UniProtKB/Swiss-Prot annotation:
ATP binds at residues 65-72. This is Formate--tetrahydrofolate ligase. GO terms for molecular function: ATP binding; formate-tetrahydrofolate ligase activity. Its EC number is 6.3.4.3. Pathway: One-carbon metabolism; tetrahydrofolate interconversion. Belongs to the formate--tetrahydrofolate ligase family.
Length: 556
């Protein structure tokens, strides 16, 4: 089988103006970025906002392993399959980050015959949204240090500056640096940390904003640090929000592209799901619901992270409600959760599969029992999967009261997802008992405890002294009703990435709590979460090249 980029380069793309016709958009509704990419103009939303909403389908997954789950691939394949059975569908995805593309992951636009295209352009600079977020973030950072240099009228304590600079690249050397070393005219020396752009508060703020005016207001709410007296200093105190919103003016417009089978796709926004809330923009999701009968969206990593944050943060703050959930699982990954080594995954092992299925069952239970949503399991098929393994996994899922459907969308595109699409169409008509994992009125501490015990399976939560102090401080400052965003390893339900499967008999430790006031949530940090990744021993960048005539190779 051809590589992903080779398949993408051989695709027959339609002009984006023709793709837009499928969802009722004309050339005047688009701002073109070449022949195959466009932003949707501002005037479209007022015209369609009174349209009835389509059905919202959330695609999530088991806890990820190095064996790969293919959540984006299934999301794209399901959208293509919906089109094949005559449904008007739009796919709503996040934009990929440059850092992982050149690091360990490679490209992130689906795989095989279920990709969004132009794949190389989406994975690289796309329409410039990530660069705009980086610029807006670093403008605020520059204004903070300029304020210190120009006399510090606000009394901002350089030791308590919480807002960090960002770069959309994996660069461990920037995790901890000292700035302002240029002498008298070089600013105030202080320690600084860089984060990767998808981890930034500005990215989360963009993705949860309802429109440009709301985005500007939210930018002004960002807490950049604290005064010597402990009072919060916000971006609006530095008069930064107007310039930040100006830099983000184009970035808030949804990006329209297509799949290999010409199904429309909104690819917009890109916060990480282990550090941030892991969902595409509210703006793009809302617009898609007004233009399609079915909107298929995904949330990052496993259902304990992406799906929980999609529901408890994105849905809570926006009013969106999913109609059904697809939980993606692979037999390879479940065998790894069952204790099998990566090198042994190609051989049949029913015992390892049965042990590892506990991970899937906990995710499935969370979706159906905690959140009250109808769900189907999509078995993302790999060539080494045996009929006995598939039969066992189907039986285990049926025992749990759900249905498992094989999705062969990597190899067959939309044709390989027709059974899944038909099942989803049935699911969205089932009774929906949607609910959150916690209530707005719960204390911040209780919210964290409910997610840990109800979703992760923890026995309880331990808070460091500093985390407990910050929780009380945030509640006194008016953050008590905010949702919580728990920053946790994606590889385990627990805060220990080595505890695979569905661990029991453990407690979650919250070591730090910080406000993300622009986004509107409170972040609780657990374990060893890196906000600036590093490159691996052999970065993907070493295999990426471009020919003399401009053809890219090696990008996944």
């Amino acid at each position: 089988m051809l590589s992903d980029i080779a398949i993408a380069q051989r695709a027959r793309l339609e002009p984006i103006t023709k793709v837009a016709e499928q969802i009722g958009l004309g050339p005047e509704d688009l701002e073109l970025y070449g022949r195959y990419k466009a932003k949707v103009a501002d005037h479209v939303w007022p015209r369609v906002r009174s349209n009835p909403d389509g059905k919202l389908i959330l695609v999530t997954a088991i806890s990820p392993t190095p064996a790969g789950e293919g959540k984006t691939t299934v999301t794209v394949g399901l959208g293509q399959a919906m089109s094949r059975i005559g449904k008007r569908a739009i796919i709503a995805l996040r934009e990929p980050s440059l850092g992982p593309a050149f690091g360990v992951k490679g490209g992130a636009a689906g795989g095989g015959y279920s990709q969004v295209v132009p794949m190389d352009e989406i994975n690289l600079h796309f329409t410039g949204d990530f660069h705009a977020v980086t610029a807006a973030n670093n403008l605020l950072a520059a204004m903070i240090d300029n304020h210190l240099h120009q006399g510090n009228k606000l009394g901002l304590d350089p030791r308590q500056i919480t807002f960090k600079r960002v770069l959309d690249m994996n660069d461990r050397a920037l995790r901890s640096v000292v700035i302002g070393l240029g002498g008298k005219n070089g600013g105030v020396p202080r320690q600084e940390e860089f984060m990767i752009t998808p981890a930034s508060e500005v990215m989360a703020t963009l993705c949860l904003a309802e429109d440009l005016a709301d985005l500007k207001r939210r930018c002004g709410e960002i807490i950049v640090g604290y005064t010597y007296d402990g009072a919060p200093v916000r971006a609006r105190d530095l008069k930064a929000e107007g310039a930040m919103a100006t830099l983000l003016k184009e970035a808030i417009k949804p990006n329209l592209v297509q799949t290999l089978e010409n199904t429309p796709a909104f690819v917009h926004g890109g916060p990480f799901a282990n550090i941030a809330h892991g969902c595409n923009t509210v703006v793009a999701t809302r617009l898609a619901l007004k233009l399609a009968d079915y909107v298929i969206t995904e949330a990052g990593f496993g259902a304990d992270l992406g799906a929980e944050k999609f529901i408890d943060i994105k849905c809570r703050l926006s009013g969106l409600r999913p109609d059904a959930v697809v939980v993606v699982a692979t037999i390879r990954s479940l065998k790894m959760h069952g204790g099998l080594k990566k090198d042994d995954l190609a051989r049949e092992d029913l015992e390892a599969l049965q042990r590892g299925s506990a991970n899937l069952m906990r995710h499935l239970r969370n979706v159906t029992e905690v959140f009250g949503l109808p769900a189907v399991v999509a078995i993302n098929r790999f060539a080494a999967d045996t009929e006995a393994e598939i039969a066992l996994l189907r039986a285990l899922v049926e025992e749990a009261g759900a249905t498992a459907v094989v999705a062969d969308v990597h190899a067959r595109g939309g044709d390989g997802g027709i059974e899944l699409a038909q099942r989803v169409v049935e699911l969205v008509e089932q009774p929906n008992r949607f609910r959150f994992a916690y209530d707005d009125e719960d204390s911040l501490k209780t919210k964290i405890e409910k997610v840990a015990t109800r979703i992760y399976g923890a026995d309880g939560v331990d808070f460091t002294r500093e985390a407990s102090r910050m929780l009380k401080k945030l509640e006194s400052e008016g953050f008590g009703r905010a949702p919580v965003c728990i920053a946790k390893t994606q590889y385990s339900f627990s805060d220990d990435p080595k505890k695979l499967g569905a661990p029991t008999g453990w407690r979650l430790t919250v070591r730090e709590v910080r406000p993300s006031a622009g986004a509107g949530f409170v972040v609780a940090l657990t374990g060893e979460i890196m906000t600036m990744p590093g490159l691996p021993p052999v970065p993907a960048a070493e295999s990426i090249d471009v020919s003399d005539d401009g053809e890219i190779t090696g990008l996944f």
